[in-house]
Structures are given as structure tokens and as C-alpha cells.
């Protein structure tokens, strides 16, 4: 599985291919995202230049990359920051375009498509028309439960909201929960025993 970052780029704009420099290939909303607003989640900057994934030329560039990966033996893709790339009902055919090559695809969706506690289930289901998705909230529940010595109280966050189990991925921790500061570094002060037990339960679900 190859980790593909197609939502944004990092670094000097001068190093971007010349054909991708025109402004129509980029979102210009900027930062200050209202995380309960899906348009802002999919068009706002998360600290890096945000690619206009709804643009057909951008999609073709990514499709060419996917085909190149497949040609060298790659059979699966992890899509970084998938929640920041829209779905067809939002006017973005990116997922329909890039998943047509017979590879396994899953997207990193931290929390949910946005920060609304309800009302975003249809968007999550629409993602799963094309890719599998992560259920990071359930991973957090597993970690917290083992860390506190209590049993988990649910059988899965998104599965209980109607998302098919065969479209969900679980983990004990991720690079985000381990390496970030206290706002996101949920697991970096937990013992390895806690993480191992969380992974054991998560693996039994996958």
C-alpha cells in the first residue's frame, strides 16, 4: 500500500510542475476553517496549498500517478486527508476518477467528514461508495478504555451509524496520535501495553 497525498502540496510553489501552477487548479479559501462546514473542510487550507480536486485536469494528473504505481506492482493506496476531498454530491468526481483501476483504496478520515455530531452520515456513506474509511474515534475509545481499565462501551463508532463493517478500518494509534502535541497526541504518553491491547481488539475487527 502506497500513501498518496492528493489534497494538498507542501513547500515552494516554484517546484510544482508548470502545468499545475495556474490558479484554477488551487483552492483559495485559506485557513480559519469552520470544521462544521463541509465546503470549508474541502476547500480550506490546512496549512498547505490546497489542490482543486474537482478539476478534471487535476484528476487526470492523479490518475496518471495511480496507473504508474499500479504498473510497478502497487495493489493498494492509502489516501491522506481524504475528508478534505469532496464527493460527487458536492460537485467533486475525484474519487470516482481515481478508484477505477482495480486497486484497494482506503481514506484517512479523522473523526468524520466534518465536526458535526449528526447529519454527516450520508457523506460518510458516499465516501464508502468508492473507498474504505478509517474509524479513528473507535480507536480512541479502545485506547482510552484500556488506559483507564474499563471495557469499551461501543462496537464501533461509524458501524453504529450505519456504515458497513467491511468498509471500516480500525487502529490502536496513528502517526497523528503518537507524534503530535497534547491537542492531537492522544497516545504518546500511553504505555505500549495499552496500545498493543487496543491494536489486538482493532485487528480482531478488521
Regions found by a protein language model. Give the residues of each.
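N-terminal small/glycine-rich loop or linker at the start of catalytic domains
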Residues: 33-50
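Aromatic- and acidic-residue-enriched segments that line the glycan-binding/catalytic groove
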Residues: 8-38
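Short acidic, Gly/Ser-rich segments with clustered Asp/Glu that frequently serve as metal-coordination loops
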Residues: 7-9, 84-85
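Aromatic- and glycine-enriched glycan-recognition loops and surfaces
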Residues: 1-4, 8, 60-61
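Active-site-proximal helices and loops of the catalytic beta/alpha 8
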Residues: 2, 63-206
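Serine-centered coil/turn micro-motif
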Residues: 13-15, 55-56, 92
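Serine-dependent carboxylesterase/thioesterase catalytic core
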Residues: 16, 47, 159-160
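Active-site mouth loops of central-metabolism enzymes
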Residues: 48-60
